[in-house]
Curated annotation (Swiss-Prot):
Protein name from the UniProt record: Large ribosomal subunit protein uL23
InterPro entries membership: Nucleotide-bd_a/b_plait_sf (IPR012677), Ribosomal_uL23-like (IPR013025), Ribosomal_uL23/eL15/eS24_sf (IPR012678)
GO molecular function, one term: rRNA binding
Cellular component per GO, a single term: ribosome
Gene3D superfamilies with a match to the protein in the record: 3.30.70.330
GO biological processes: translation
Keyword field: Ribonucleoprotein, Ribosomal protein, RNA-binding, rRNA-binding
Length: 111
């Protein structure tokens, strides 16, 4: 699996946004992990390659990726019940001593 090559344009679409919450901050400090919202069809190897491509200037090395599907919540619209859309999130473990700086993102220049 490590020998796979991915389309850089696809990798730039895999990670949608960082998940910023109290729980995400706690996990980040305690376990050296970052939580991202990812595309619904993203796979673990794609997420790993996307993180390493986007933050290649910082030489970030991903140790592991765990992916979870989050169900949408049921919400009431007046007297009708509706459902918000579900989404997928990825827990990215990076090597000890490394951190991701969100202000230094490369645009995925491939040579």
């Amino acid at each position: 699996m490590s020998g796979q090559t991915f389309n850089p344009e696809r990798l730039m679409q895999v990670i949608l946004s960082p998940q910023i919450s109290e729980k995400a901050t706690f996990i980040g400090e305690k376990h050296n992990q970052i939580i991202f919202r990812v595309a619904p069809d993203a796979t673990k190897p794609e997420v790993k390659a996307a993180v390493e491509l986007i933050w290649k200037n910082q030489k970030v090395e991903v140790e592991s990726v765990r992916i979870s599907n989050v169900k949408g919540k049921e919400k009431r619209f007046g007297r009708f019940m509706g459902r918000r859309g579900g989404w997928k999130k990825a827990y990215i473990s990076i090597k000890a001593g490394q951190e991701i700086n969100f202000s230094e993102i490369s645009q995925g220049e491939v040579k």
